[in-house]
Structures are given as C-alpha cells and as structure tokens.
Amino acid sequence: MSAEQLRAVLAAARRGAKESFGVDVEFTQPEEQPLKALFDRATPDERSDWSDLSYDFKRGKGDRKRLARGYAAAFRSDENSLDDQIAFAEPYLLAPVREKTYDGFAEAVTATLIARLDQLKSQKLSDGGELLDGSPSNEVLYWALIGKLSFPYDVVITNQLIASAEYVGSSVHTAIRGGITNGITTGNPFSPRGVTAIVSTYPVTGEDGVTRALRGGESYSEADSARYAGLLLVHEIGHQLYDLGHAYGKNACVMNPPAMLRFREWAERLSPADCRPR
C-alpha cells in the first residue's frame, strides 16, 4: 500500500473504532521497518522452539494427527459453542464433518487447512517470486511472539502474507482459509499498551489465484482496500483494548470474522448500532 492508502487505512480505523466501541483512537506517524531485520532478532533457541510448534507444510513433513489434536483442543477452549463453530465453518469446508464432536470437527478443519495451504504454496507473486518462500515471514508464531523481539509498537500493518499451521491450534475462521491470518493481537511488554495489534493487508490486496478465489473472485479498488484493512484493524482493536472474543454469526458486529476473505460482504453487513448490547 502507498503512504496515501495507509493514511486512509488509519482514518477508516479511527472511524470504525468510534462507531463500534465509542472510543477515540489516535495513531502516531507511521514508521517503516524491514521485516527481515525484525525476525533476525529471534535467537537460535527461539527459532527451534517455534519450528517445533509449527506444521511443516512447505516440505510436507508435518504430523497431521498432532495438528488435528491441537485444533480439537483449541475448539474445546473457544468461548463459542461447537454448534456455532460448525455452523460458521461448514459452508467452506473441503471435507465433511463426519461426526459432530470436537475431534470430528477438527478432522474436517485440518483436511481443509492442509488442502488450502498446499494450494497457497504453489502461488507466485506478480514479480514471479514465490508467494511463500523459505523464510519464516509467513509463520504465525513469528508474529504472535513479536513481544520477544524488543518491538516497541502498539500497531503493525504489514503487506506480508501470514499463513501457516501450528500444533497449538488456532481459530476456526483462520484454519478454513488455509491458515491465512488477517490479523493477530498479542502480548508485547515492549509496546506502550503491552499488547500489539497486527493487520496483514495481503488478504485484501493480494492477486494470486488462491487469495482472489477466497475473496469470491474480487479485486478491490484502492479506496475499498483501505477501508476493509481499516475495519480489520478495528477488529484487532476490539481484541486489544477490550479483550473481546469472536462473535461468530453476528453479522452486524465487527468482531464477527469475515467469512473466508469476502471483505465486501463482511463490511456491508456491519451495523454497530445493531451490535451493541441493549
């Protein structure tokens, strides 16, 4: 995104935070940071630990059963019911839920996750480079554990695709997209608030075939891309400032994650006045 688009993202986030949470949010002047230099701060021990927790889809050497167990555990601990999680995910699964248990649901989600990750790893960037290369920049854990890297920012906006699978499990809406993460909110003792909200703009702007298909075949204008990225930041601010969970199925609420990457449909259904408790 250009500097002008980034300003539009932050303006959309300010408006959205006011509408959804009644809070006035201000952002400092953005600073650009090289991603490689940031992740190079990880120690060899940290890299080894994070690698052990990650499913190695790039080399096809992951433990699928362990992955499914991790997702079953994550779904059990989710504040949403099993029925609500299944209802949210089922239209987008590539494998059937053979039994409506946490284990049965996790099997279907894991099959979908792996299939879509396999599709993603064959995609190219517009310059012909690999969408997912040998670096760890796409790995969720490197972002989720950014607080270990002496990173003093409350908000991060990146154009890097974040897509991976971890044995510790993740939310269902991320898994069914092939591990694509729109955003992460994570503890960070080096940031002013002690929590960093991270948004990836790649799901909104990326033009590889898989990402575009997950958007329903759409490519967005610069103005729409900035608006949708701003709303994704509002979603993360809900996690960051208010510790809000995911409001699966509550289409009026910004805390209901986008289905797949269909950001236009998601944004058009938002109605903060209809979301607030009465």
How should each PLM-predicted stretch be described?
Residues 7-28, 32:
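Domain-scale, conserved, charged regions that form catalytic cores
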Residues 15, 19, 143, 257:
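Charged/polar, solvent-exposed surface patches and flexible loops
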Residues 17-21, 147-149, 190-191, 247:
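A generic structural signal for short, solvent-exposed coil/turn residues
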Residues 22, 30, 34, 152, ...:
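Proline-rich intrinsically disordered, low-complexity coils
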Residues 22-24, 195, 251-252:
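A generic structural signal for alpha->beta connector loops
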